[in-house]
């Protein structure tokens, strides 16, 4: 089980990313537009750098919905490998069966 503070930190990051998503997209569009002048690009880069560090989506960490474990989390299920195995053995995950050959 992950510390409660780490789980809270991730939820706070998710809210920050959501809050600044439109502004980041707007600034990145200016930067990536080839028709923008050098001054516009420069100002957009400075504004982008002044946004909070946690506003970047790449700083988010996928965590298990049950335990909060940060590693070995399957995107499709949102569970870590341990809890996914337990859920599959109980039959809680529809369509997922243990391989046998």
Swiss-Prot record:
GO terms for cellular component: cytoplasm; small ribosomal subunit. GO terms for biological process: translation. It comes from the Bacteria. InterPro entries: Ribosomal_uS14, Ribosomal_uS14_bac/plastid, Ribosomal_uS14_CS. One of its GO terms (molecular function) is structural constituent of ribosome. Keywords: Ribonucleoprotein, Ribosomal protein, RNA-binding, rRNA-binding. Pfam families: Ribosomal_S14. Transmembrane segments: none annotated. The keyword RNA-binding applies. Belongs to the universal ribosomal protein uS14 family. Binds 16S rRNA, required for the assembly of 30S particles and may also be responsible for determining the conformation of the 16S rRNA at the A site. Part of the 30S ribosomal subunit. Contacts proteins S3 and S10. This is Small ribosomal subunit protein uS14. It comes from Saccharophagus degradans (strain 2-40 / ATCC 43961 / DSM 17024). The lineage of its organism: Bacteria, Pseudomonadati, Pseudomonadota, Gammaproteobacteria, Cellvibrionales. The gene is rpsN.
């Amino acid at each position: 089980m992950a510390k409660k503070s780490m789980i809270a930190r991730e939820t706070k990051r998710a809210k920050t990313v959501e809050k600044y998503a439109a502004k980041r997209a707007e600034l990145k569009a200016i930067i990536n537009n080839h028709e923008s002048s050098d001054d516009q690009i420069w100002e957009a880069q400075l504004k982008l750098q002044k946004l909070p560090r946690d506003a970047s989506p790449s700083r988010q960490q996928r965590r298990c919905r049950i335990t909060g474990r940060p590693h070995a989390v399957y995107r499709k299920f949102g569970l870590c490998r341990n809890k996914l195995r337990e859920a599959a053995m109980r039959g809680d995950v529809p369509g997922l069966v243990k391989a046998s050959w």
